Amino acid sequence: MSVKVNGLDHLVINVTDVVRSVAWYSRILGMEVKVFDPGKGKTPRTSLVFGNQKINVRPCDADKVDWFTADHEAAGSDDLCFLTSSTPDE
């Protein structure tokens, strides 16, 4: 079985301090900071944008209902979300 990856949708990084982290990425790497509403009454999220790429910045103490995440998240860990034309059945 092979899945055709078309691109990277986004990356999520877990951090202990969202404000400090986005300040660093913005100041040092020139990334644009955006805050967006994920909908469904969830807490607003902060992301870093550069070109067509996005990094979501997740606080380590985020509610698991607000952020779907691994059972053992830690500062410095991350997750990748890919874009694909493959279906779940494939």
Q: Residues of each region from the PLM?
A:
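Glyoxalase I/VOC metalloenzyme domain signal
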Residues: M1-L8, V15-V35, V49-E90
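Short acidic/glycine-enriched loop/turn segments that link adjacent beta-strands
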Residues: K40-P44
